[in-house]
Swiss-Prot record:
Annotated protein name in UniProt: Large ribosomal subunit protein uL6
Xref: HAMAP family: Ribosomal_uL6_B (MF_01365_B)
Record's subunit section: Part of the 50S ribosomal subunit.
Lineage: Bacteria, Bacillati, Bacillota, Bacilli, Lactobacillales
Functional description taken from the UniProt entry: This protein binds to the 23S rRNA, and is important in its secondary structure. It is located near the subunit interface in the base of the L7/L12 stalk, and near the tRNA binding site of the peptidyltransferase center.
Amino acid sequence: MSRIGNKTITLPADVTVSQEGAVVTVKGPKGELSREIVSAITMTVEGNEVSFSRDSDDSKTRALHGTTRANVANMVEGVSEGFTKTLKLVGVGYRAAKSGSKLTLSVGYSHPVDFEDREELSVEVPDALTIKVSGISKQKVGDLAAEIRAVRSPEPYKGKGIRYEGEVVRRKEGKTGK
């Protein structure tokens, strides 16, 4: 029994969900998202409630029941409110700059690291040490934020690097001399 899969999704007033074959489409004020769902999972829309049920009880279908419900819930939240990930640059001389459609990071390498803008995502640099990635797809926002973080992930000795806002970096003690 999937506890997440059995929960219903309550739709905001300005969001509509439709299904055509195996493709679920969610439309809202911020845009439109589509995703294919497994044929063993059945989606039912009643008024402003969306519920999911599964045809069989095999392990793969049980695993996808809650996942499908969570994905559609994220789509509903994305088209109504959107998602934002904030990254902080920690380190002497580390900075980010946005020029046109290009994000440039100076994070201690001999060369700057560039990222081009992506469809459906917006990247803002409110100040030189903060990067905000926002969009309607939780997966795409998280993927781009993870790519940016991977350029210089936080190291455990001094804590320098790119980290998510609110992320706690576990610190290590350095070597002790003789």
